[in-house]
């Protein structure tokens, strides 16, 4: 079974994804830098989890699984 992300990580990721839809791509490294620019998250672990979830959201949007 996979790991379950915490609710606040999903919430922050969705807020960033909806507020800045053209800033994020399928590239995790690019998204990681953008999350660092757009938020005040100080923890590297939290930043990476948010960037990973945003990467997943971008991929799902491109595949038509979310609107």
Curated annotation (Swiss-Prot):
One of its GO terms (molecular function) is structural constituent of ribosome. GO terms for cellular component: cytosol; ribonucleoprotein complex; ribosome. Disulfide bonds: none annotated. InterPro entries: Ribosomal_eS17, Ribosomal_eS17_CS, Ribosomal_eS17_sf. GO terms for biological process: translation. It holds the Pfam family Ribosomal_S17e. It comes from the Archaea. Keywords: Ribonucleoprotein, Ribosomal protein. Belongs to the eukaryotic ribosomal protein eS17 family. HAMAP family: Ribosomal_eS17. This is Small ribosomal subunit protein eS17. The lineage of its organism: Archaea, Methanobacteriati, Methanobacteriota, Thermococci, Thermococcales. The gene is rps17e.
